[in-house]
Amino acid sequence: MSAQDKLIKAQHLIDMNDIIREGNPTLRAVAKEVEFPLSDDDIILGEKMMQFLKHSQDPVMGEKLGLRAGVGLAAPQIDVSKRIIAVLVPNPEDSEGNPPKEAYSMEEVLYNPKIVSHSVQDAALADGEGCLSVDRVVEGYVVRHARVTVEYYDKHNEKHRIKLKGYNAIVVQHEIDHINGVLFYDRINAKNPFEAKEGMLILN
């Protein structure tokens, strides 16, 4: 039984045991493109990946399943070397603690996503990045593009082109790196981890 066959079983909920960690060769491989029209198996896998992210962000389900909260997941992280990523970025509460009008600023499963253009300006998160596949803290600015245009297909086999900036752009670039065999710390300057080149945007 393949990893995907196990993951898409009706009763299976993806948990931390399904997520492979650094050192596993799948994380360093360039993942294969999915074929269209999408197979039921690939559609279900995408739905299971999104379900994991929702569970991970839910305090009750997250604790019950022992999950680390995540905003993105790539198929290679669950040992499936395919170009599928799921992104779930919640909107924050307002200054008075009221819930946002829209729960998520991005909620999408992207098949065969690719960056087709990007800004000259770089950006990095002030607090650095983490990863569900990396069980240690690696400090430093993860240098990425401040703005990207991404093409992808959805589960209905429809093609989309979206422009992203800020945190959403960072998250999508992190996940696209996974399908290209790249981990976030590859983008940290080893000699000077907190080097901020002129014009680089630091996102809080």
From Swiss-Prot:
- Cross-referenced Gene3D superfamilies, in alphabetical order? Peptide deformylase
What InterPro entries does the entry give?
Peptide_deformylase (IPR023635), Peptide_deformylase_sf (IPR036821)
Q: Does the keyword RNA-binding apply?
A: no
Q: Which Pfam families match?
A: Pep_deformylase (PF01327)
Keyword vocabulary terms for this entry: Hydrolase, Iron, Metal-binding, Protein biosynthesis
List the active-site residues.
E175
Q: A GO BP term, please?
A: translation
One Gene Ontology molecular-function label: peptide deformylase activity
Q: How is the cofactor bound?
A: Binds 1 Fe(2+) ion.
PANTHER family recorded: PEPTIDE DEFORMYLASE, PEPTIDE DEFORMYLASE 2
Q: What does this protein do?
A: Removes the formyl group from the N-terminal Met of newly synthesized proteins. Requires at least a dipeptide for an efficient rate of reaction. N-terminal L-methionine is a prerequisite for activity but the enzyme has broad specificity at other positions.
Q: Hey, which family's this protein in?
A: Belongs to the polypeptide deformylase family.
Listed name of the protein? Peptide deformylase
